[in-house]
């Protein structure tokens, strides 16, 4: 037990470094913390010096068996390798581990899934009050699930949602009037004092990302959409505002992206509308 506590302490020191020296955002730290803890629970070692490439490969196999995509596994692997390199720099040795032999998984092309306004309305008919709010805020505001999970009262100002997003970038978005009215009702009925999404009314115990993902998936499944994942709503937000006239630069700002190339990957399903856009933006006569 003492050695296990020692590992926990070493991880805490690494996370403190990420927070105070690297100045990583709250959601980035939350993700790193979860990945590190889950990794150690899977491999079950008493000391970091026991870590080997066999442990890494077994962890990758376990992630694959759980249905994680190659892209997800590689993202988690990058976080683990960053932690291990930090430990090496701090003088911790891994006699049985060769970092250069850690190989990334083969990635399939990313799923290009998005939903139209009509499909979202169809899904919302199956949602209860909380499920409706979670889905609608993601679609209205283009939120990442980590941003949705971390929402607090201090982030709300009327219809505006202001927060620190990915890469510690300040961002604001706006919800519909209907969503605001329903959210106000939720806050009042559940006696919200800090975190918006709580497990028990009146208590400031926030839901986990996994809790929220489960709640959002249920109405999509009932509406006939079997392979829902929350980030598809962010793609849906981007495609929806593009279809209604937003420029790529405007879409970039509304999503909070640093690079326009990232935004381009979020816009789908415009094929049937290209003639309209050419006529509107290219061939309009004075």
Task: Show the residue positions of the predicted features.
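Conserved catalytic core of the tyrosine transesterase superfamily
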Residues: 1-286
